[in-house]
Design a protein with these regions (language model features):
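FIC/Doc superfamily catalytic core
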Residues: 1-372
Length: 372
C-alpha cells in the first residue's frame, strides 16, 4: 500500500488532508485485489504538493489511458484502481454529505464514473460472491426488488437512534450494526464495499468523529472480511453471524485502540493449522509479535497452498483476489524470495501446466504452524 505518511504527519493542513484522502482512496482498492499505477502515485504526489489541482489530476489520468494503444485485462483493472482512487480522493476532501438513498447511490456513481456503465444504478438482479474467508461460500444479499426499501429502512432507523443514551462501547456496537446491515444490502453490481467505506467515513465525520487514520487505508481487506463474517451464518455447520471482528476494526477507528486485525482469524471451519492460531488470537493485540516473522500475504499464501500444487489462477481464486500483477508482487515474489515457494517446472516458467508448491522450508514452516 502506497505510503503518504510524510504528508499526513507534517503540519500543513492541506497536504495532510490530501495525503490522508489519497492514502485511504488507494488502500480501499485492495478490497478487490486492485493496485493503482505508478503514474497515479506520481500524479497524487503532485496534487498533494499543490503543483496541480484535483481537476487537473483527473484529466491527466483520463488522458493517460486514452493515449494507450493496447489494453490488456491488467490495464482494465489498473484503470479501475486509478480512476476510483482519484474519485474517492475528491469525495473525501469535500465538505458535503447526504444521509439518504440518493446520497448513497450518488457516492457509487461518483466513485465509478467512467469505470462501470451501471455506476450509481441499483441492481435489478440477484447476486452471489464466493468469499475466501467463507472458503468459497457466499453471504445472502438482499433480493433486488427489496433493495430500495431496505436502504430507506436502515437509514431511517439510524436517524432515530439516540447516541446520547449509550456509552462508548454501545456507540461502537451500534455503528457496527448499522454499517454491517447497510453493506449486506449490496445494492450495486460491483463496488459495494468501497462505496460503504466512503459513505461510512463521511457519515462518521458528519457526527464529529475524526477518522483521519490509516484503518481504511491499511486494513480494507480486513474490513471486507469482517463485514462478510458479520452477515454469514450456516447453522448446520455451527457457524453463526459474529460482529466481533468488525467491532475490533471500529474500536481501533473510533476509540484509538490497538486490536490486532488479522484476516486469517476470520476463516470459517478453518483447517487445523489456522484453527490453532485462532485460539491463540483471543485477547491478543497488535502490540504483540506474531509467532512467525513472515509477511501477512506470504502467510496466507502458505496456509492456502499447504500440501497442494496449484496454478497461479487456482491460487488467486482460493485466496479471493483477481488482479494478477498485485498478487504476484505481494504474494508470489516475496514467497519465492523467502525460499518458501517454488515452481513445478523451474526450467520452463511459461509451461502450460505450471504449478506452485511449497519448498522444504515452506513445508517445515507450514508444519510448525500446524503443530501449534
Amino acid at each position: 500500500m502506497t505510503n503518504f505518511d510524510e504528508y499526513i504527519r507534517q503540519g500543513e493542513p492541506q497536504k495532510r488532508e490530501k495525503g490522508y484522502a489519497w492514502q485511504t482512496a488507494i488502500g480501499l482498492q485492495a478490497v478487490d485485489g486492485l493496485k493503482p499505477s505508478d503514474y497515479l502515485i506520481e500524479t497524487a504526489r503532485k496534487d498533494i504538493e499543490g503543483e496541480i489541482t484535483i481537476d487537473e489530476a483527473e484529466q491527466l489520468i483520463r488522458s493517460y489511458y486514452q493515449s494507450k494503444i493496447a489494453h490488456t485485462p491488467e490495464d482494465v483493472e489498473i484503470h479501475e484502481a486509478d480512476m476510483a482512487s482519484t474519485n474517492i480522493r475528491r469525495l473525501l476532501t469535500e465538505k458535503t454529505f447526504a444521509f439518504t438513498l440518493v446520497g448513497l447511490t450518488s457516492i457509487h456513481r461518483r466513485i465509478f464514473d467512467g469505470i462501470f456503465k451501471f455506476a450509481g444504478q441499483i441492481r435489478d438482479y440477484n447476486i452471489t460472491k464466493k468469499e475466501w474467508v467463507l472458503r468459497g461460500d457466499t453471504v445472502l444479499y438482499v433480493s433486488a426488488p427489496d433493495i430500495r426499501k431496505a436502504i430507506e429502512y436502515d437509514l431511517e432507523q439510524e436517524r432515530q437512534f439516540d447516541y446520547s443514551k449509550v456509552d462508548r462501547n454501545g456507540l461502537v456496537s451500534h455503528i457496527v450494526k448499522f454499517v454491517s446491515g447497510l453493506w449486506q444490502i449490496h445494492p450495486f453490481g460491483e463496488g459495494n464495499t468501497r462505496t460503504t467505506a466512503v459513505f461510512t467515513i463521511l457519515y462518521l465525520r458528519s457526527m464529529g468523529f475524526d477518522v483521519t487514520n490509516d484503518l481504511f487505508a491499511n486494513h480494507s481487506w480486513y474490513f471486507r472480511n469482517a463485514l462478510v463474517r458479520a452477515n454469514y451464518q450456516n447453522v448446520q455447520k455451527g457457524i453463526m453471524r459474529t460482529s466481533e471482528y468488525l467491532e475490533l476494526f471500529f474500536r481501533n477507528l473510533l476509540l484509538g485502540e490497538n486490536n490486532e486485525l488479522r484476516n486469517r482469524y476470520m476463516v470459517v471451519n478453518p483447517p487445523e493449522e489456522l484453527r490453532a492460531e485462532q485460539v491463540q488470537q483471543i485477547d491478543r493485540t497488535s502490540t504483540e509479535q506474531p509467532t512467525e516473522q513472515v509477511p501477512e500475504q506470504v502467510r496466507v499464501l502458505l496456509l492456502t497452498l499447504s500440501n497442494e500444487q496449484l496454478s497461479l489462477k487456482g491460487l488467486m481464486e482460493k485466496i479471493g483476489l483477481k488482479h494478477r500483477p498485485t498478487f504476484v508482487e505481494n504474494y508470489i515474489t516475496p514467497a519465492l524470495e523467502a525460499g518458501i515457494l517454488k515452481v513445478l517446472y523451474p526450467d520452463k516458467p511459461n509451461h502450460p501446466r505450471q504449478k506452485y508448491l511449497l519448498t522444504a522450508k515452506g513445508l517445515a514452516l507450514y508444519n510448525e504452524i500446524k503443530s501449534k
